[in-house]
Amino acid sequence: KASAMDFDDLLINTYHLLNNFPEAILKYQNKFQYILIDEYQDTNHVQYLIIKKLAALNENICVVGDDAQSIYSFRGAKIENILNFKNDYPDYKSYKLEQNYRSTSTIVETANSLIGFNENQIQKTVWTENEVGEKIIICKCGSDSDEGRLVANTIFEIKLREQVFPKDFAVLYRTNAQSRSIEEALRKQNIPYKIYGGLSFYQRKEIKDVLAYCRLTINPNDEEALKRIINYPGRGIGNTTIQKLIVISNTSNISLWELINNLDKYDHKINKGTCSKIEEFTTLIKSFISQKENQDAYFLAEHIAKSSGLFNDLYNDKSPEGVSRFENIQELLNGLKDFCENNEENLLANYMRDVALLTNQDNEKKEDFNKVTLMTVHAAKGLEFPYVFVVGLEQNLFPSLLASDSQENLEEERRLFY
């Protein structure tokens, strides 16, 4: 419709062109007589088919890659492309580059030991001439909160003892949702941090949406919260209607909440169907307000997330991004549960006061340079730090629950940890 193509379209249409038009494939086979491909383990199926077409005439093809670093199957990468190269080109020559120049021998030997459990791989033995280095330390924690505190306290101690900087530390986790407990612990120690390639926990859209419902429950006159969620999840109250309501509330010198509870008193020119939707929304929020003094923060927030439709809206999105957003909501509720278990004053209003302090820190503009780096293991590929923590190494977290259904997926989790 837009006369445009995304990256996948470009690949698929290139393949169709080469497959269906003999003059096109002949032209490009003669044009590209030598083909070199880097990071071959990350290629997907259609890229593989394009490569096969282009290389078929001359078979002058050189691929570079490491099957043990194939960690992007969720993007369509096929480890079989590199594993089966020898079958596609029987006259191939293989050169193994096994010396590691970056890591200590302790890390190299541990990684070799780990990846050795994978059956589906090209056999190799990585080695290094580097020093032995420090031992890898394994810590057991009772909960994610304990783990966050342990990481923050250890960073604080090493910083003082070794006279190093926050930028020398990285904390890696399997999913973005795991950052919450780490972020909260670092903030309590006043240790600056940044989320690499993403937003801090309380800046993520789905978290802001749930908290906006909570803010409106505590204070119905919070107009920013009301405007954010009056039509989310979608309930048929469009932007035009919202703008009309804002104008009326401003000219009548009343709050938006007061207006939408007394619409029949004002000349609004909003159709009956939309008025009915607005009434349903106010009834929903009033039901939350009625519980704010007699239910704890966890119970009420979970009820809000489910009754508002927000929980279902995210649950039904099965894309990788949707799954990540749903995990973030679950992690927010875990945080609320921790709050209720550790505080006698555990009403939603008390929790929101604590969260306000955390989100205010997010809004402070600070330099990104000298901060602890928090990121997923996927995002860490290719980076290095003097001190690294890997958190959440437990069944169904890392390795992921999604990996438990097949040997292939479990081996990818092992490659990811490698």
Label every model-predicted segment.
Residues 57-60, 66-68, 89-94, 132-136, ...:
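Short glycine-/polar-rich loops that comprise or flank the Walker A/P-loop
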Residues 179-191, 204, 211-418:
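Conserved helicase C-terminal RecA-like lobe
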Residues 1-84, 99-103, 304:
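Conserved helicase NTPase motor core
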Residues 65-68, 75-79, 99-101, 111-112, ...:
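A short beta-strand-to-loop transition that corresponds to the Sensor-1 phosphate-sensing loop
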Residues 30, 49, 109, 113, ...:
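Generic recognition of well-ordered alpha-helical segments
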Residues 68-75, 102-103, 196-218, 230:
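Short alpha-helix plus adjacent loop in nuclease-associated cores
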Residues 70-73, 103-109, 116-117, 123-124, ...:
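Switch/connector loops and helix/strand junctions flanking conserved nucleotide-binding motifs
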Residues 90-93, 98-192, 215-219, 251, ...:
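Helicase P-loop NTPase motor core
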